[in-house]
Amino acid sequence: MKTLQNNFVEAIGNTPLFKLKAASEITGCNIYGKAEYLNPGGSVKDRAALALIRDAEEKKLISKGGTIVEGTAGNTGIGLCLLGNSIGYKTIIVMNDNQTQEKKDLLRNIGADLRLVPPKPYKDENNFVKYAGRLADELKSSNNHGVVWANQFDNTANSKGHYETTGPEIWEQTDGKIDGFVCSSGTGGAIAGVSYTHLTLPTVCRV
């Protein structure tokens, strides 16, 4: 395994599987956890952040010096900001003002321009996600290098990133011997992407 990486981007992914001993013994199955906390930003959301940025770059929506805007409760914002620092983008994170002080401090400490808004239901135009999209539109005319709204909740690049990385990694690490996949869901990117990977492979994997 390559352990020396040239930059933050290269350190994302290829996380190990480790056997969950107690769960395996109780069920009589081999149950493994994928150590996504070993991504450099500390969570699986680094994968989504990278996929969202690469998608914007491929579509020529942003170049070095540009700005990424996102509404997030934490981990995706951390990934976007750390990647932005590494690649050369400014990051504006829109977050509900009732989030923990630790999250706010962490995002500010890694360089995010943090915009706090009052909590609103999704149908409200000032919901943090919709606020982020509107802010990105407002800023586009002021930056020649591009301003993009990452939009992790609706951007299919999120699930595509997992289809191209997380799913194949699990397949290779288990030599294709996988009967089931369990995943919590926030945006749905990880579970959708990994599920689609296994639909395209010669296996019967319950999700």
Model-derived regions: residue spans:
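PLP-dependent amino-acid enzyme catalytic core
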Residues: 1-199, 206
